[in-house]
Amino acid sequence: MARPRGRNPGITPEILLRAYSIGLFPMAESADDPEIFWVEPELRGVLPLDAFHISKSLAKTIRQKPFDIRFNTDFDAVIAACAEQTSGRPSTWINKTIRALYSTLHHIGHAHSVEAWDGDMLVGGLYGVSLGSAFFGESMFSRRTDASKICLVHLVERLRERSFTLLDTQFTTEHLKTFGAIDMPKDEYARMLEKAMESPNLSFSDS
């Protein structure tokens, strides 16, 4: 179960990166709540990069190349889409403070987006934070069938190519478990995170 660690409206990008390095991440009660609080789950969602699983049906869809997959071309649009309230997601924890913080992290090279495009339409995507050899997945959205799933596949491919060692999903969902996500005890996660933080910051972007 998630354990809030207190509210702090004065969070800077530097404090945010430090928090990630010790196993904390921020959330808001709602999109309308200006405050954010730290979360440290007792069980941490992790998607092992060496045990990532793709279903046959999804693999077939990927071979058909239904979308143009891009990295970091419209980060702000991705986080805005993740923050939208939809019929399947009536509430969201992404408030204006979080959007501003992660936009700054993007501009300094620590937050990244994977995007699915259909022509000039953004139809799916995800975003997260890179630090050391870890990538912390934050949120995803989909406006077309399988768009976010395909973005996740491309994320994992890139992380493997760049020698990342940890893909943190914060929590697990039934959706993520189909890809191989597991619940990792906090102590075990802390050891894995510490090792990832010993690495220099790995490059996620092509630039």
UniProtKB/Swiss-Prot annotation:
<dbReference type="InterPro" id="IPR016181">
    <property type="entry name" value="Acyl_CoA_acyltransferase"/>
</dbReference>
<dbReference type="InterPro" id="IPR004616">
    <property type="entry name" value="Leu/Phe-tRNA_Trfase"/>
</dbReference>
<dbReference type="GO" id="GO:0005737">
    <property type="term" value="C:cytoplasm"/>
</dbReference>
<dbReference type="Pfam" id="PF03588">
    <property type="entry name" value="Leu_Phe_trans"/>
</dbReference>
<protein>
    <recommendedName>
        <fullName>Leucyl/phenylalanyl-tRNA--protein transferase</fullName>
        <ecNumber>2.3.2.6</ecNumber>
    </recommendedName>
</protein>
<dbReference type="InterPro" id="IPR042203">
    <property type="entry name" value="Leu/Phe-tRNA_Trfase_C"/>
</dbReference>
<dbReference type="GO" id="GO:0008914">
    <property type="term" value="F:leucyl-tRNA--protein transferase activity"/>
</dbReference>
<comment type="similarity">
    <text>Belongs to the L/F-transferase family.</text>
</comment>
<dbReference type="GO" id="GO:0030163">
    <property type="term" value="P:protein catabolic process"/>
</dbReference>
<keyword id="KW-0012">Acyltransferase</keyword>
<comment type="function">
    <text>Functions in the N-end rule pathway of protein degradation where it conjugates Leu, Phe and, less efficiently, Met from aminoacyl-tRNAs to the N-termini of proteins containing an N-terminal arginine or lysine.</text>
</comment>
<keyword id="KW-0963">Cytoplasm</keyword>
<keyword id="KW-0808">Transferase</keyword>
